[in-house]
Amino acid sequence: MLNIIYVVSLILIKFIFYKECNNNNNYYLSNIELYNYKLRKRNRILNNNINDRKSFLSDLEQNYKPLFDIYELSANFEKRRKELEKKTKGEENEIEKKKENDLEEKKENEIEKKKENDLEKEYNDVINLLELSLSSEYKELNADVSNNDNSGHEENNKHKLNKKNSSNYKNDKSLDELIKGAILKLKQNPNIKNKNMLDYDKIFKIIKEKLINKNLASNKIKGGDNEKLKEEKKQSDISTNVEVKKDIINDQLNKGIPTKIENKDDMINKESNKEDITNEGKSNSLNNLNTLNNDGNIITKVYDHYTIVTNSNDILNDISIDASDISKNSIGGINIPFNENDNSSFTHQRYIVLSNNGEKKYKIVLMTKNPKFMDMDGIYDEEEKKESLIELNQKVNKEENTNLYDGTGTLYYGKKSKKEKENTQQKGGNNPNVDINILNNNNNNNNNNNNNSNNNSNSMNDEEINYNNNNNKESPSMFRRFINFLSFSGNENETEDTLIYHNKNDNSYKNKKEGTGKNNDNNDPNNNNNKKILLNVDKLVDQYLLNLKNNHTSKQELILVLKGELDLHSKNMKNVINNAKKNLEKYFKEHFKEFDKISYDISTPINFLCIFIPTLFDMNNMDLLKQALLILHNDLHEYVENWSFSSTYHTYEADYIKEQDSVYDRSPKKKYIKASKKLYNNKYSFLNKFLNIEPLILFAKKLNSKRSNIEKEILNFLPKELRDYSTWNLSIIRVFNAWFLAGYGNKNVKVCVVDSGADIKHVDLNGNLYIPEYNEKYEMTQDFYNFMVKNPTDASGHGTHVTGIIGGVANDLGVVGVAPNITLISLRFIDGKKYGGSFHAIKALNVCILNKAPIINASWGSSHFDVNLHLAVERLKYTLNGKGSVLIAASGNKSNDNDISPLYPATFTFPHVYSVASISRNFEISPFSNYGHKSVHILAPGHHIYSTIPNNSYKIFTGTSMAAPHVCGVSALVYSVCYNQGFIPQAEEVLDILTRTSIKIISTKKRTINDSLVNAEGAVLTTLLGGLWMQMDCYFVKFNLEKGKKKHIPVVFSAYKKGVYETDIVIAIIPIDGKSKIYGEIHIPIKIVTDVNIPNFQESPRRGKNYTIDSNEAQHDEVLSYICENALYNLYEYDSHYLLASVILFFLALLSIFVGMIYMKSRKHSDKKCSKNLMKSNYIPEMDDGMEETQQLQQERRQYFRELFGENLEKNYDQHFVQDFGQDFRQDFKLGSTPDLKQYSDIDLQNKIQQPERKTVKIIINNFEDRKKETKRRLLKGLNYDGENAKKHDFTNESISNSRKNFKFSNNTEMKKNTIKSEDVKIASDDNVNKAMNQLDDMFMK
């Protein structure tokens, strides 16, 4: 109905605006056909009526090429720039290295030469000093020897010769002692530098030789010593000159010359750091730095407020930017105080002005890149040291912009907020001093014995393990436990049935014990702010028996949740797990002879331990099972956060009726509610068009046939598959527009489908399905790997159908998915009966984490709350380096309220979990779908969805299992845009984008949190233009900038989170000539500061500079404008603004119809011919007696007035009638409008009608004369006084009828005949006569 109202309103508006429509019926009918086409849009099957389709698609693809390929073009341009930069740097580095090597050799030679000179100088100084000190003593010694030699005779020469030899020996001995004594004195001399490093043996030899050969010593010793020093230089200790080396090295470091001690890698790193520092200074400089760096074909030019990177000087010369109002280089940043209640509003606005000063025409495409967010939580606490933003920015780890999803994933807890870490410590998750307290019920022993035994066996520091029993209540009997088991329910108020973490001084356990009923929040396991609630041994036994009853298996899976930061592969943890296994095996072998061994399985990094317990127990020996569990707990209690047996999950299809799991009643919990839909302020909103008359005028003036056929052209450009089946599910979530804006997705983005598997050979899935290779980190056997990962055979077809909805390939065959160009990972955990256990689900989630999948689809669930799965899903928050993974879950198909009867994992209260309900073709929540205004987030198509099934087939399925994949596909498109921009978004932010861009659905009752439908176009567009921090209007995604034109681009900002956000607005510039290879990008850095605790924080003005938009403003792109405006004319977008506009238009339409009817009526009465025919129709030949008598009376009264006032009625009316009856009397009886009979004044009725008796008329006149004396008030009340006696006459129905009988006419038969001849009757027309006639008519009728 609303569609019809809206379309009819638009038709009427067009009719009002265009007068020529009245004369052009074909045009009007063609417009009605156009609107009718829009009304039938939801059920259409696409067709192709274009003859020259090949050329048309080529033109259309060329028109959209900047949108489809802009990211690839930008990435290739950046890759080329880096290659050229690397190549140029490589060549420069080689030249620099060669220069450095030459310089280094030269410096080394100089250093060696200097060392030789210094060493030689130092030795010469020491030797000269010793020689000078020993010369006098040595002369005395030589003098004595020479005197002895000259005395005596020749005969005594032999004796003298012998004596000389003996004296020389004595002299040598004395010389040695003399030199040694001098050297000893030299060592004690404080003026000698490095005296301890000198080679004194060498000095001894040199001094001795110089003294002995005094005459030749100066030349020989100098040459000989130099040669010996050169030979012994390499063998001598370089440490003799440490001080000299230190001075030289310091001089070189001060001059920036690399020394020999530095490694080559250090030198390269040092140079690269210098380059980074230099470039950083240039990019952030506030001075006018017009530096030009031409790296091959890539030119980088840095301006005050932005940077241009291009391969052509034409762009540098033609394009100019004014970014002074927005760039962080000019204004430092935009300060917006964070407010939780207003974080969804865009409150501040700035402008970017782009101008084309050249001769070419350019295509402009806008996007954002390299966003960074710094959480300031706790940084500026009073107790901590305050740091500047520059210091904080230096601490932020830079993420690589390539291979974001490659490698092996893990869980990263380092980015926990301060509050999360405190909560974790309180829960005991990361605190080694926190212990598990067992509240055990032992029916065989009394309470005191239990407390004593457990306090003695388990204690840890100040914490105690208490086996607390309620002394006022007896333990449940065997019969009662058996009844509870058969009823599949437990007692919520049994505090004995829980295990909780608590500290010694914590009163939470006491408060919990005192609280009762559902109103106690501590009973709710979903409350993350409370202590962890753990099942005790008795509950585990009940779970074991229940699973044994429902599933006849040889083993049951006991899953233990270990602390997240433990390394299960460490030697210590392996020993702990093996010891626990051996103790458990020993206990089983003591009681069961047929038992062999126990197997277990671990899952890291999710840190789950699964122990397969054999089905050896039943109701008769469950005490043995209880004791075995206590043994296991005693070995692992220091490392365990929770434990329970595996639960069962089922898929959500509409034909599912019976729930197989036991219903574990839980108190209703307020779901984590996303922010309400408030994407833009009214002033800057895309939705502002609803309240603006201009779009309506533009719509009314849309006469261009090309523009009117744009939608048809776009539809024909879509994949061929869409023309072979109904696309209502893709149409209503606006996937087609999303594809035109950002393409079909990105292959690097992985979506993990945890379901019943998939047909990996399906023609529509094979191109996108990815089978991870076997990895030891999967920690599964080869058979298990084949079952879950390598060959996930889909027996039910459910998983294949879900996978096709998410990412069916666009290959002109079959169907196409929401995101046709992404990577799909199908993991099987559901068996052929559509059921699966929590152990397999957790193993599948672990594989998703290891493969870095940011999106996980869960079209399954259970009403049983599983703590293990709860913790596994919680740890998805810490994947992808703390960014988190999104879990999209189906809400269920039982038409229940999930707020009261929750289904898991859809109602897990985590910000990265998203619950999806189903919507039908009528835009109403499907009758089978679960709902919940506190627990279900969004709606998606889930009714009669056509998708893939095994064996290359297709089928229509219905259920919320089909709704969740649509949201998964839209999430994949959002992640693809983020990948193209070079970053991984926060999981919570992705879901917030889906929520805020969703399409509002009109409903009489609130059924979900937002009552809105997922909107692929809005989500992609919001991500494309800056996300929830910053937005630009849709029209500026792409436009043409012609010669001499300008474009003012408004940008709005919001304080989405508390912290500091930075990004780059990138404006891609492409010549309109498709053959040109010119390309350029403008990078404008943006900073948004929202933390008011930052020093010197002051809110920025809400508006920046004022700009005037004139006739030189560039026009919007035609096709893109249609996509942007389609939000107004799209019949599926039901927003509150849309509803208001529709209602206003509807009333305007009704008013227009009413005015038109009045106008046409007046025109009809003014027509002479139509008025005559209307008068003729008043005289009906055949009538009853009453009507006949009335017509006769009217004719006789007319004749009477002609006789009374004469032929000139206009002249005598006031003279006779007004004077006789009075002015007041005339107004009293002017009770109705008088028809215009002036045109009939020339008609004479005397020959047609017999004259009435004068007596009858006199009776009327007398009555009027009596009434003349009475007041207006009494006359209106219908009172009549007779003459002077004022006798009252009663105007009752009886009196009126009697009065009518008093009128008698003559020649009644002839009058009737004359009346029948109505064609000849003409009434004299006079205004005064008509007024009097009508007054009398009213009087007679009363």
Swiss-Prot record:
Composition bias, Basic and acidic residues: 503-516
Keyword field: Autocatalytic cleavage, Cell membrane, Cytoplasmic vesicle, Glycoprotein, Hydrolase, Membrane, Protease, Serine protease, Signal, Transmembrane, Transmembrane helix, Zymogen
One matching Pfam family, short form? Peptidase_S8
- Signal sequence bounds: 1-18
Q: Where in the cell is it found?
A: Cell membrane; Cytoplasmic vesicle, Secretory vesicle, Microneme membrane
Q: How does it sit in the membrane?
A: Single-pass type I membrane protein
Q: State what protein this is by name.
A: Subtilisin-like protease 2
